[in-house]
Design a protein with these regions (language model features):
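Intrinsically disordered, low-complexity regions of eukaryotic proteins
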Residues: 9-12, 118, 125, 155
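A charged, solvent-exposed segment within the mature domains of Sec-exported extracytoplasmic proteins
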Residues: 124-185
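Acidic, serine/threonine-rich low-complexity disordered tracts
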Residues: 27-117, 165-265
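Structured domain cores in non-transmembrane regions
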Residues: 98, 105-140
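N-terminal secretory signal peptides
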Residues: 1-21
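Compositionally biased, intrinsically disordered/low-complexity regions enriched for serine, proline
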Residues: 12, 19, 141-143, 248
Length: 265
């Protein structure tokens, strides 16, 4: 079996994938929605398999200009917890703070991202282990917010797409920036370094209607977010009539894949 390691923050970009899903928590004046879903992870040509049963809880208060999201999930040897909050700012949803915790076979990772629009900066903190060799990656950095640059996290991007608050570029694509750990172009899954920085990574979503299903399908490049991704195999999101994700497929290197789908039964 290959001993190449998986970074916990990047565990097949599972945090990113999980945050791109519909969820809801009750709020006094907000529109609330809850949705169960399932994550199936297959590693190294099926040598390792994980299933994660999740509940997303989302509360969106458009009149008050706030949203809150809570995500909890549990599976055999795998669990996660995500809490996120944001605000309606300059006509679009913008993140304020996101905290996440993930554990896979005892390997834990924690991250906190805080957005300060008055100071025009993002505080990014992460600590996690690689999957097999348990090598540590730590990021404590502050990233400036340049004027005129669109910034999201996965939650705000999902809400902006659903509410049609994400304007398209001339070529029809949807672009924004997401704060994450800076990855070198030749980084391998087990590579670590003494000091890490955070960065505003460009995120581009190309959406087209599928000829067979007639549903919108979005594709995006994961290589800026995971050393297990490759440009020749973009991630794919299938959207429903409400412009929310129904299914996600994340093909990776070394016979690895992540599939996320709503539970209909």
């Amino acid at each position: 079996m290959s001993r190449q390691a998986i970074d916990r923050r990047e565990f097949l970009t599972l945090p990113l994938a999980l945050l791109l899903w519909p969820r809801a928590r009750a709020h006094a004046t907000a529109v609330a929605h809850t949705a169960p879903y399932r994550v199936d992870v297959s590693l190294l040509y099926g040598a390792l398999n994980y299933r994660l049963e999740e509940i997303f809880a989302e509360s969106v208060d458009k009149s008050g200009g706030r949203y809150e999201v809570a995500v909890t999930g549990e599976g055999d040897g795998i669990s996660n917890r995500i809490e996120s909050a944001g605000t309606l700012r300059q006509g679009r949803w913008a993140p304020l703070r996101t905290q996440s915790f993930f554990s896979v076979k005892g390997r834990e990772s924690r991250s906190t991202v805080t957005y300060d629009y008055a100071a025009r900066q993002v505080d990014y903190r992460f600590k996690g282990e690689t999957f097999f060799l348990r090598r540590l990656r730590v990021v404590e950095d502050v990233v400036p917010m340049p004027e005129g640059v669109r910034i999201d996290d996965a939650i705000s991007a999902t809400l902006n797409y659903a509410d049609q608050l994400w304007p398209a570029e001339p070529d029809g694509s949807l672009t924004t920036h997401i704060v994450r750990r800076k990855i070198s172009s030749n980084e391998g899954p087990d590579d670590v370094q003494a000091r890490y920085q955070a960065e505003l990574a460009p995120f581009k979503l190309s959406v087209a209607v599928d000829a067979e299903s007639r549903k919108p399908i979005g594709r995006f490049d994961l290589t800026r977010f995971s050393s297990w991704a490759r440009q020749s195999q973009p991630a794919q999101i299938t959207f429903g009539a409400d412009r929310r994700p129904e299914q996600m497929n994340l093909p990776m290197i070394l016979g690895t894949s992540v599939q996320i789908r709503l539970k209909t039964a």
